[in-house]
């Protein structure tokens, strides 16, 4: 898993642009500092930064308003990565809900942190 995370972020960072020898800075938008996603983003950045001399990528974690904020900020080009729940990724890609007037079909998932099954009670 550790190598998958480093490889995925490094590959995506290189795809963003810039020479491999130059230092590339990336940010991961997460959620509130008291939630689960902020420490998860911090752990990903620690893994990336541990081997930054090999790939030239420096990672920083940012506390944000969560999934919708992260998606919109990535779309605006202000974040390179963001943690988003899969239902909001679906809405962003397909255009319903908050994204009805402004879908984001270019959004891509790099990895899944954990499964999020849910129960619908009617």
Kindly label every feature range from the protein language model.
Residues 6-15:
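Bacterial N-terminal signal peptides
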Residues 17-19:
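N-terminal signal peptide c-region/cleavage motif recognized by signal peptidases
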Residues 23-122:
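Short, glycine-/small- and polar/acidic-enriched structural segments
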Residues 1-5:
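Positively charged n-region of N-terminal signal peptides that target proteins for export
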């Amino acid at each position: 898993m550790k190598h998958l995370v480093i490889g995925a972020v490094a590959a995506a960072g290189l795809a963003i642009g810039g020479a491999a020898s130059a230092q590339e800075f990336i940010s991961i938008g997460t959620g509130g500092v008291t939630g689960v996603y902020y420490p998860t983003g911090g752990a990903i950045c620690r893994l990336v930064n541990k081997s930054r001399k090999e790939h030239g990528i420096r990672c920083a974690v940012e506390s944000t308003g969560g999934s919708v904020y992260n998606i919109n900020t990535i779309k605006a080009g202000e974040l390179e990565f963001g943690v988003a729940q899969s239902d909001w990724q679906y809405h962003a890609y397909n255009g319903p809900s908050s994204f009805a007037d402004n879908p984001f079909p270019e959004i891509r998932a790099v990895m899944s942190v954990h499964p999020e099954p849910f129960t619908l009670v009617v």
